[in-house]
Amino acid sequence: GITQNPSKLNPISGAEANAARRKVILQAMYEQGYITKEEQEEALADDVYARIQNVDTALKENETPYSYYTDELISQVTEALKEQLGYTDTQASNLLFSGGLQIYTPQDPQIQAIVDEEVNNPANYDAARYSVEYRLSLTHPDGETQHYSQETLKTWIQQVKGQSGFDGLFNSEEEAQTAIDEYRTALTQDGSTVLGESVTMILEPQTSFVLIEQSTGYVKAINGGRGQKTANRTLNRATDSLRQPGSTFKVISSFAPALDACGATLSTVYYDGPYSSGEKEFRNWWGSDYKGYHTIRDGITYSMNIVALRCMADTVTPQLGVEYAERLGITSLVSQDQTLSTALGGLTKGVSNLELTNAFAAIANGGTYTKPIFFTKILDRNGKILIDNEPETRQALKDSTAYLLTSAMQDVMQSNTMYTRSGSGVKSTGTTAAIPNMSCAGKSGTTTSNVDVWFVGFTPYYTAGIWGGCDNNQPLKGGTVSNGGTSYHKRIWRNIMTRVHESLSDPGFTVPDSIETAEVCRKSGKLPVSGVCSSDPRGTAVYTEYFAKGTVPTETCDHHTRVTICSASGGISTAFCPTNQQISKTVMVVPEDGGETDDSRFSMPSECKIHNGSSTIIHPSESA
């Protein structure tokens, strides 16, 4: 509940009373076993009031709230002072706010301004709705105190106002305030009095954005939320919020380890057909139809769920998938994430935008992971270096793996249509984010019920990630719901990156010496059979693929075969079929239990049932 008499116990204006109360609480916590004697004494020795006064003084000197970047910078510097110099919380805070430190940051003011402008530009959004953070405390006539929140407000609107479909979002601030006023009036009709009330309006859908220079690890800009920032150290959606990453995680947890450690190539194929694990059935994002054999390249380009799942199940294992995500800097995973769902970004806690974007920055940096850098050095008031923040790097992926993933993610952002029968192709998922006159690669992500949307991508210069969604997990679209749709974030990513790269030339992505090319069949991932793979009824299945040196396949395609068909029946020709009705045709060899797929439509037919060699009985009347 809310602290009794909070103004009297204000740690700034009522520090003495607060200290007495603090002492009582710490003693009670010790007596009830919540803390040890040593922890009690350590807490009592902490000069917390000096720290609070310093922060309060700093805030009063600068009435404009800190930016999201500064908020995170404060956290990073505080942790560095504690970890590297052994300072306590109090000492680090005192030094930071009143010690005259000189802190050098790689933030780019021009890029930061572009990010802030685009994230807050109403023209970039298809909706403007509002959620509320609401707190109300009442004293009832019988003297009892009761507390209310946005959740009780939502229930009241649904049940008392009869709006059963109300999802917690309002169409305007005025509409939200009217509902709050009506709610308060209803609650105080019995003579209850208001002890305290706070209302914060939050613009929805929300957004966070991170931009990193992958070659250095320098964080050039972040934005932790759409709308005016009204206070310091508020929720930073770029660094603090853990959200489900959706299909962006296919690259990190399934395809990256498959290529890097498991002998797979971009041409390795998995069968896109009905798939279940335990009691859970999986589907592709486009619906219930399946496409048959498809490569890892296709799995990335068209964000194919079944291909990613089979890759993790058959090649990688969930354990290795989690290990690779952690190698790429994801720190929020737990043991329960060692499941197939991780391949699709179904995580226990989720990930932060900062860590997800930096994982892709490692791919953009040739496989070298660099811990994100918010400051380069800290000097004391006399100019002496306290901390020289050297980059922490490690080789997370082979340079060949990084390039292969980059090449496939370039296809995501180019206009491509899946290799299928006419009229059933799926489009590449990132074309909306493509920026003009600059090489770019990236991956989209959308979570169940369209709750979260992501796009993380990079150029030869910068890696950027954007998250979109509602703070309280309302769907962005679905049925009659329209809370911003599922594409606005890609437009914002494109707008920001286009402006950031305006004066930069396009050097392209460097192909490392560890890469070679070869022609393969896209339906087997193996060397094509001359005249067979190229004559698939859907068009040639032969294409040129990149490989890590030494991994070009040596076997020939075993998913295509050439057969003779009877044109009269469409079946395999028999010895009895007329020669002039026999044609040669390429067909697919598919799994017997693979279900109905695009490939099964072109699979081996049964024998001709018209010309089967059966004896024909001719009656006398018929021969007359």
Residues covered by each model-derived region:
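Extracytoplasmic/secreted proteins, especially bacterial periplasmic and envelope-associated proteins
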Residues: 1, 17-30, 42, 64, ...
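Non-catalytic, structured segments within soluble enzyme domains
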Residues: 1-121, 125-150, 326, 331-332, ...
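Structured segments of extracytoplasmic/periplasmic soluble domains
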Residues: 2-6, 12, 25-33, 43-46, ...
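Second-shell loop/turn segments in exported
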Residues: 6-16, 25-26, 30, 54-62, ...
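Conserved catalytic neighborhood of penicillin-recognizing serine enzymes
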Residues: 56-62, 263-321, 369, 380-411
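A penicillin-recognizing enzyme superfamily signal
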Residues: 105-128, 132-143, 147-201, 205-213, ...
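Mid-domain, small-residue-enriched loop/turn segments at the edges of structured enzyme/sensor domains
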Residues: 281-285, 315-358
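Low-complexity, Gly/Ser/Thr/Pro-rich intrinsically disordered linker/tail segments
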Residues: 518-623
